[in-house]
């Protein structure tokens, strides 16, 4: 008789199933001015965006590949198709989405989540959104939740032009420049002054195409006194060639506003995940990051928060699970500019079967940030002797009137704890999985229940076969 797990079991194939590729259009692999110009025409860009793309390409060609983190030698942009258009236009009614794409999102639970607990959903498949919808009562509050292309070409065009890649300019690093040249898809959100969105919005990104890249752009503006919780989910089937994800997230938190940005990333183990996320927080604003990173072959993820206004604050809560063949280099950065600002980073890193997990924290306190407070706590759990976990803190404090602290711990699973749980009827695998889930509860307890269950399921999948 099989033992019942403490969480519902799911099959890894839910994420790894590959749909037949019925693309309406696939750009040739590589990156040239002709390819970027062709993409711009395909997207019907305004002149300023076409020029922005070509300028970003020029910057891309001038910048070097970062060499201070995991090796990116296995990534060759000449073998990556930067744009793949699915065989459908964006729909606002799920019934009109093509059946094969609909089946994929059904397996991933997107429609069920929308019905149960979401104010709006956007679903991107390869390079374009195929579904986007927002509940009428949320739209009635004046909340704007649409795809980036509609915002760029519609009544929010001026707002897009004002904010687009101002927080993350193409000069930031080589993959930011790549994003500026070939971005496609993503979501645009504007929450008006004083509006509190009581249930989350979600965007889900699925990369099905082999040897392709996904470069969605997310732009969120939460106006004065407003609040929002935005959830981002990502997955892809596994191929024997490299795929690339180089999205960009720009978040603007206005005076006394609050934004929580939650991410569950479960990319396939052939993915290079080089996402860039950044937030600008004004006076009295609150920025909360909740991050769970489980997939990809190589991951470089360092959300950055700029605490510009007085009394602004940031919290980052994250968990990373690096298994066999994975090198996940993650962390967070905060820049204190305003007075009496505060930041707190609380992370958990787990590594097994030779996986490498690295946490980088960066705290900058400017001269103007008198009374700033910052605390960083990182705990690492290594499940075997082949795995590796590193913590790399960096602090740049430019005023004496600041309180900054850093704490790091590295450990392994206690044999006594496993024995105790086994004496209560658990298998060794279930006991170890439960301990790891408890270790990562700093993230799961911050998520809506449906997403906490998904995260625990992902941990359980990663733990399978970890005995011995």
For each predicted feature, which ranges?
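Low-complexity, polar-biased intrinsically disordered regions enriched in Pro/Ser/Thr/Gly
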Residues: 19-23, 92, 171, 237-240
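Short acidic (Asp/Glu) and glycine-rich catalytic loops that position anionic groups and cofactors
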Residues: 18, 33-37, 396-397
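Flexible, glycine/charged-enriched surface loops at secondary-structure junctions
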Residues: 68-71, 428, 451
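Intrinsically disordered, low-complexity terminal tails
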Residues: 2-20, 28-30, 451-467
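Conserved beta-strand/loop scaffold segments within soluble protein domains that form the structured core
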Residues: 131-133, 137, 141-426, 440-468
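N-terminal amphipathic, basic helical "cap/leader" segment at the start of enzyme domains
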Residues: 2-6, 10, 26-172, 176-177, ...
């Amino acid at each position: 008789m099989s033992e019942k797990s403490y969480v519902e079991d799911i099959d890894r194939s839910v994420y790894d199933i590959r749909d037949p590729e019925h693309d309406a259009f696939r750009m040739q692999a590589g990156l040239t001015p002709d390819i970027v110009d062709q993409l711009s025409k395909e997207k019907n860009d305004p002149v300023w965006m076409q020029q922005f793309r070509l300028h970003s390409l020029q910057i891309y060609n001038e910048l070097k590949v970062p060499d201070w983190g995991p090796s990116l030698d296995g990534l060759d942009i000449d073998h990556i198709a930067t744009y793949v258009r699915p065989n459908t236009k964006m729909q606002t009614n799920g019934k009109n989405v093509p059946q094969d794409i609909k089946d994929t999102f059904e397996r991933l639970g997107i429609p069920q989540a929308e019905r149960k607990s979401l104010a709006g959903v956007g679903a991107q498949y390869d390079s374009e959104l195929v579904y986007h919808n927002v509940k009428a009562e949320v739209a009635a509050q004046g909340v704007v939740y649409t795809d980036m292309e509609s915002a760029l070409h519609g009544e929010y065009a001026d707002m897009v032009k004002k904010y687009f890649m101002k927080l993350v300019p193409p000069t930031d690093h080589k993959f930011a420049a790549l994003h500026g040249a070939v971005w496609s898809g993503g979501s645009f959100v504007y929450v008006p002054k004083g509006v509190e969105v009581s249930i989350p919005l979600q965007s889900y990104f699925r990369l099905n195409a082999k040897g392709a890249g996904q470069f969605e752009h997310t732009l969120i503006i939460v106006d004065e006194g407003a609040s929002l919780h935005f959830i981002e989910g990502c997955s892809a089937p596994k191929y024997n060639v490299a795929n690339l994800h180089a999205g960009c997230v720009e978040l603007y938190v206005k005076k006394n506003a609050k934004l929580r940005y939650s991410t569950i990333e479960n990319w396939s183990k052939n993915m290079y995940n080089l996402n860039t996320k950044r937030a600008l927080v004004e006076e009295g604003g609150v920025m909360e990051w909740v991050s769970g990173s489980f997939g990809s072959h190589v991951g470089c993820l360092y959300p950055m928060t700029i605490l510009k206004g007085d009394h602004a604050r940031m919290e980052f809560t994250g968990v990373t699970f690096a298994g066999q063949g994975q090198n996940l280099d993650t962390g967070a950065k905060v820049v204190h500019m305003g007075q009496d600002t505060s930041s707190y980073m609380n992370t958990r890193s787990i590594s097994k079967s030779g996986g490498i997990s690295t946490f980088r924290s960066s705290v900058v306190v400017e001269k103007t940030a008198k009374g700033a407070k910052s605390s960083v706590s990182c705990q690492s759990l290594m499940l075997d002797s082949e795995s590796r976990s590193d913590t790399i803190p960096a602090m740049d404090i430019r005023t004496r009137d600041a309180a900054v602290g850093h704490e790091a711990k590295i450990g392994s699973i206690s044999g006594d704890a496993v024995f105790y749980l086994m004496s209560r009827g658990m298998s060794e695998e279930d006991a170890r999985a439960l301990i790891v889930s408890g270790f990562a509860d700093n993230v799961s307890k911050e998520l809506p229940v449906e997403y906490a269950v998904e995260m625990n399921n992902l941990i359980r999948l990663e733990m399978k076969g970890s005995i011995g």
